Swiss-Prot record:
Gene: DREB1I
Single GO term (MF): DNA binding
Function field: Transcriptional activator that binds specifically to the DNA sequence 5'-[AG]CCGAC-3'. Binding to the C-repeat/DRE element mediates high salinity- and dehydration-inducible transcription.
Subcellular location: Nucleus
Feature: DNA-binding region: 54-114
PROSITE patterns in the cross-refs: AP2_ERF (PS51032)
Record keywords, A-Z: Activator, DNA-binding, Nucleus, Stress response, Transcription, Transcription regulation
Entry's family note: Belongs to the AP2/ERF transcription factor family. ERF subfamily.
Region Disordered, residue ranges: 1-50, 169-198
Name of the protein in its database record: Dehydration-responsive element-binding protein 1I
Principal location: nucleus
InterPro entries the UniProt entry points to: AP2/ERF_dom, AP2/ERF_dom_sf, DNA-bd_dom_sf, DRE1A-I
Species name: Oryza sativa subsp. japonica
Keyword DNA-binding: yes
Pfam family, one: AP2
Length: 251
C-alpha cells in the first residue's frame, strides 16, 4: 500500500537521489567518520586496582596497607560475606580459605593455600545455618591457626635457649677443673723446689770469690797414698794409677 502510494505520488521507487547514492556507494569504498562529541565518556576516568594480584577474595583497604576479606555466598545472587580487616595479605587469604571450607566443603573449595584444608579446623557446611555461624567458625579457625603458628615459632627458640644453658653449665665445671689443675701443678712445683737438695742460694751466700778460692785450694792439695794389695790384678791397677798420678802431679 505504501509503495503503491509513493509510486503514485512520485511515479518512481526508489527516488533518484537514493539511486545516485547507491551507485556511488557501490563504486567507492564506504567511509564512516564519527562526529566529534562534546560529552565525556561514560564510566570512571581513574581506576585504582585494590584486589590482590595472587590471593582470591582479598583486596587492599585505604593507604595504610591493610587488607580486607569478602567472599560471595554461593547460591545467593549479590550476597557477600564480610570476614574482617587484616594487617597482612596472607592472613586475609587464610580467612578466605576458612570461609570457602565452611561454605563449600573440603572437596569443592577453591583455596589460596593447599595446606588450609588440614590446617584450618572448620566445621562442615551442614552444621552452619546462617552467615553469622560462618563468621564465627572462620574467626575460631583463624584464632586456633595463629596460636599454633606462634607456639611453633616459640618452641625452636626455647630449644636453643636450653642448649645454650647446657653448654654454659658444662663449660663452667671444665673451667673450674682447669683452675684446680693449674693450682695443683703450681703447688707441686713449689714442693719440688722446697724438697730439692741442690740450692744455689748457698753459692750466693758464700760469694763467688770464696767459691773459686776453695776450688783452687782443692787443686793444690796432694792426693792420698794408695795402699798395696796382694792380688796381681790390683797391683797392676795400682801401678797404672801411680804412673798416672806421677804424670798428673809432677809440676
Amino acid at each position: 500500500m505504501c509503495t503503491s502510494k509513493l509510486e503514485e505520488i512520485t511515479g518512481e521507487w526508489p527516488p533518484p537521489a537514493l539511486q545516485a547514492a547507491s551507485t556511488t556507494s557501490s563504486s567507492e569504498p564506504c567511509r564512516r567518520l564519527s562526529p566529534p562529541s562534546s560529552k565525556r565518556p561514560a564510566g570512571r576516568t581513574k581506576f585504582h586496582e585494590t584486589r590482590h594480584p595472587v590471593f582470591r577474595g582479598v583486596r587492599r583497604r585505604g593507604r595504610a596497607g591493610r587488607w580486607v576479606c569478602e567472599v560471595r555466598v554461593p547460591g545467593r545472587r549479590g550476597c557477600r560475606l564480610w570476614l574482617g580487616t587484616f594487617d597482612a595479605a596472607d592472613a586475609a587469604a587464610r580467612a578466605h580459605d576458612a570461609a570457602m571450607l565452611a561454605l563449600r566443603g573440603r572437596a569443592a573449595a577453591c583455596l589460596n593455600f593447599a595446606d588450609s584444608a588440614w590446617l584450618l579446623a572448620v566445621p562442615p557446611p551442614a552444621t552452619l545455618r546462617c552467615a553469622a555461624d560462618v563468621q564465627r567458625a572462620v574467626a575460631r579457625a583463624l584464632e586456633d591457626f595463629e596460636q599454633r603458628e606462634s607456639s611453633s615459632s616459640v618452641f625452636p627458640l626455647a630449644i636453643d635457649v636450653v642448649a645454650e644453658d647446657a653448654m654454659s653449665a658444662t663449660s663452667e665445671p671444665s673451667a673450674a677443673s682447669d683452675d684446680d689443675a693449674v693450682t695443683s701443678s703450681s703447688s707441686t712445683t713449689d714442693a719440688d723446689e722446697e724438697a730439692s737438695p741442690f740450692e744455689l742460694d748457698v753459692v750466693s751466700d758464700m760469694g763467688w770469690s770464696l767459691y773459686y778460692a776453695s776450688l783452687a785450694e782443692g787443686l793444690l792439695m796432694e792426693p792420698p797414698a794408695s795402699g798395696a794389695s796382694s792380688d796381681d790384678d790390683d797391683d797392676a791397677i795400682v801401678d797404672s794409677s801411680d804412673i798416672a798420678d806421677v804424670s798428673l802431679w809432677s809440676y
